[in-house]
Amino acid sequence: MATPLKLYRNIGIAAHVDAGKTTTTERVLYYTGMSHKIGEVHDGAATMDWMVQEQERGITITSAATTCYWSGMDKQFESHRINIIDTPGHVDFMIEVERSLRVLDGAVVVFDSVAGVEPQSETVWRQANKYGVPRIVFVNKMDRMGANFLRVVSQIKQRLGSTPVVLQLPIGAEEEFKGVIDLIKMKAIHWDEENKGMTFKYVDIPADLKSTCEEYRAHIIEAAAEYSEELMEKYLEGEEFTEAEIKKALRHLTITNKVVPVFCGSAFKNKGVQAVLDGVIEYLPSPTDIPDIQGVDEHGDVIHRKTSYDEPFSALAFKIATDPFVGTLTYFRAYSGILKSGDTVYNSVKGKKERIGRLLQMHANSREEIKEVRAGDIAAAVGLKTVTTGDTLCDQDKVVILERMDFPDPVIAVAVEPKTKADQEKMGIALGKLAQEDPSFRVHTDEESGQTIIQGMGELHLEIIVDRMKREFNVEANVGKPQVAYRETLKQAVEQEGKFVRQSGGRGQYGHVWLKIEPQEPGKGYEFINAIVGGVIPKEYIPAVDKGIQEQMQNGVIAGYPVVDVKVTLFDGSFHEVDSSEMAFKIAGSQCFKQGALKAKPVLLEPIMSVEVVTPEDYMGDVMGDLNRRRGLVQGMEDSPAGKIVRAEVPLAEMFGYSTDLRSATQGRATYTMEFCKYAEAPTNIAEAIIKKQ
C-alpha cells in the first residue's frame, strides 16, 4: 500500500563531528522498529556507519540512506514514511552534506549542549540556507558535564542569525538530567529507562520550573500569533490558543524558514529522540508542502513540475556508490511522476537514454528490491552507465534539466604510486571508481613526471581514499607528501594576436586569431565569448579555439597551475580555404592565450583556510604567536566552556603538521577545525619561491 505524499518526510540529520548525530539516527531506527538492538558509535556497531573506515574512526563519511515509519510517541498520527539521510560532520566531507541537502525537504540539526554551535554547524547551516531547507534543532548530550541548553539557543540566534523557538526545556542537566518539559502541552515527559525509553509518561511540571516554563511558552504564543490575523487578534485579546492552533502556526513558520523549533535531550541516554520524531512529522514539510521543482527544457525555457504522481517523471541523481554485491548504485530523488523497473529514462544532461533494471530501497547497507519509485521517494538504481552526480533523469518525451550542483575544487594534492607492477592497473580502476562516486575528489596524471596525482578537500579525505583503495580494491599504494593546489589568475586586460602557420610541401596549417583576455571576479570561473562577425573565422573552427585556450589554462602560464577566473573574447582572425583545420585553430588559440596571459600581469593564488582553535586560556599567547608565524590573520576571539576560541584565516601551505604542533604546544588540550575559505594572491616572496621550483 503506497503512502500518500502528505505522509512523506524526506529529511537529513546533520551536525558537527561529535555532536552525537549518528547515535541520534541509531535511536531513530530503534524507536521506529527498523533495528532491534541499538548500535553504538564507540563500539563500532552503528547501523548507518557501514564502511569499515567509519566504524574504526567513529565518524560518518558517506551519506547512508534509510527509510522508516513513525506514527507518534502517543500513536497520535497516521503512519508517516520518513526517508532519512545521515550526513557526515567532518569538514573534509562537506560535499556529502551539500549534496544531501540539495535533495531533502527538511533537516534535523544536532548540536552538542556543551560545545554549542561549532564551525561545522555554521557551514551546515549556511548550506541549508542556500537550498532553503526548513529545519528543527535537537540539542543533544544534556547529560554531559557542562551541558547548557539556553547558551546553545542564544548561539543559534547570534551566530547563525536564526529565530529559535524553544518547544522544550530540560529537567535538570548533567548527571541530574531527568527528562524534558513539553511547553505546548505544559507537561513534563519522563522516559522509562528500563526499556530504553520505548515508553514514557506525562507528569506535572516541577514547581521550581513553572515560572520559567510560562515565560518560554509566552514566546511560543508570540511567535504563533504572527501566523494569521485571526491568531494575532486572539493574542491581543489575551485569549488562550489551542494546541492545534499553535502547531499549525509553527508548522507554517518552520516550512517558510521564519522560525526554528528547538528540542533537547540525550540520545545516548534514550531521552528526547522520540519527541524529535514527532517534531519531524509536525513541523517539517512533506514533498507537497515545498514549492514546485523548477528546471529548464531543451531550449532553456523555465518549466515547473508539481510533486505529483500524474506529472511526467523527473529525478535528480545525487550520489553514485560502488556496492561490493550489486555494482554501481545511483541514488536519486524522484520529484514527479512514477518510474517502474524496466522503464527507459533519459539523462537530459548527457543526452543519453538508460534502461532501468533493478530499483532498490536502501537501509544503510542492506537493501530491498522494489518495483517502482514514485514522486517524493529516495531510492537507488543499479548499473546505470552514463549518470554522474547532479544529472537529471526524466521522461524522454517531456525533457527537463533540473538545477545542477556546484562542487568546490580540491585544495590539496598527493602523488600516489602502486607498490608493485601488479597493482598498477588495479589502481587505475580503483581511482576511477572512487572519483565517479565523489565529485570533490579528482585524479590526473602529471605529464612531466608521469605520476598519478590525487586531489581532495583535506588530508583526512585523501587518507580515506587511499584506505579504501587498499580495503575495497586490494591496491597497495605509496603516498607522497601533500602538496597545495595553487591556481593562477590575471590582473589586467590585454588584446593579443596569435598565428599558427606551417608550410612544408603538401597541405599546410593555418590558424589566425585575435583574443581579448580579461580578469573576472574571484569564483566567476572561465567564460568564452565568440564575437566573430561576417565569417572571418568559420563556425566549425570556433570550438577548437576555445578548446586550445582551455588546455593552455590547465597548464598554467607562470608556474604550471591552472588559470582561473578569466573571460576570453574571440573577436577577429582569418582563415585559409585549404590549409585551415581544427588543429591549426586549436594551436593558435592555445599559443595566443599563453602569449597574452604573460602580458596580463599573471599572479599566483593560494588556498586560504578558516581555522578555529579552542584552547585553554593559559596557552592563548602560544597559539596566537604560532598562527602569526604561519602567516595567519586572526579574525576574532571569544570565550567558550573550554577556554578561548580563536578564529583565523591561514594559508593551507602553512598548516601541514599543525595538529602535531598544536598538541605539543598545549599538552594535547587544544583542538582545531579547518575548512577551505577562499583563494587569495600569494605574497611575492612566496610566489617567487614556488615559480622557481617549477
UniProtKB/Swiss-Prot annotation:
Annotated Gene Ontology cellular component terms: cytoplasm
PROSITE patterns cross-referenced by the UniProt entry: G_TR_1, G_TR_2
Pfam families on file: EFG_C (PF00679), EFG_III (PF14492), EFG_IV (PF03764), GTP_EFTU (PF00009), GTP_EFTU_D2 (PF03144)
Transmembrane segments: none
Subcellular locations according to the entry: Cytoplasm
GO terms classed as biological process: ribosome disassembly
Superkingdom: Bacteria
Binding annotation for GTP: 15-22, 86-90, 140-143
Keywords tagged on the record: Cytoplasm, Elongation factor, GTP-binding, Nucleotide-binding, Protein biosynthesis
Single GO term (MF): translation elongation factor activity
Cytoplasm in keyword set: yes
Domain tr-type G: 6-288
InterPro entries: EFG_II, EFG_III, EFG_III/V, EFG_IV, EFG_V, EFG_V-like, EFTu-like_2, G_TR_CS
Family indicated by similarity: Belongs to the TRAFAC class translation factor GTPase superfamily. Classic translation factor GTPase family. EF-G/EF-2 subfamily.
Annotated function: Catalyzes the GTP-dependent ribosomal translocation step during translation elongation. During this step, the ribosome changes from the pre-translocational (PRE) to the post-translocational (POST) state as the newly formed A-site-bound peptidyl-tRNA and P-site-bound deacylated tRNA move to the P and E sites, respectively. Catalyzes the coordinated movement of the two tRNA molecules, the mRNA and conformational changes in the ribosome.
Protein name, UniProt field: Elongation factor G
Organism (species): Legionella pneumophila subsp. pneumophila (strain Philadelphia 1 / ATCC 33152 / DSM 7513)
